[in-house]
């Protein structure tokens, strides 16, 4: 640890590190969203599907995020629960143009919310209704209705329409998540 790191820590200037789980079905845009939140010089040019999980980092104005980008492929979703205890917040990404798999996304969300490591914690959940740029995309209101988000009463949650490739809607979501993390004890 360098002198500046120590000094900033002593002065309370060092950013608080937060562990965030990034979940959602495969091809929903999880990795693209996390990549877009990193500084432009740290972004990957080629995004490939995540196998298992990867750890990514990005910073907001007051927090340092360590994101566990979890594979959304069916055979890897059982790995999600091994990281629930570590998570201080959740980003759940939905492909708003994939109407056929909205039921699967809803089932995975219910499984997540009912898991013992999540169920009794007031953990903030940010939903990105991604791929809003596509012609057949559902609105974030419709996605919210299909996933029955209004039934989530014991956790703060927010849904943002997003276009991960252009970066639209991402900052709004991160700002909300940052506010929640700073005000909610998980």
UniProtKB/Swiss-Prot annotation:
It is a peripheral membrane protein. SMART domains: ARF (SM00177), SAR (SM00178). It comes from the Eukaryota. A lipid is attached at residue 2 (N-myristoyl glycine). It holds the Pfam family Arf. GO terms for biological process: brain development; cilium assembly; fat cell differentiation; intracellular protein transport; protein localization to cilium; protein localization to non-motile cilium; protein polymerization; protein targeting to membrane. This is ADP-ribosylation factor-like protein 6. It comes from Bos taurus.
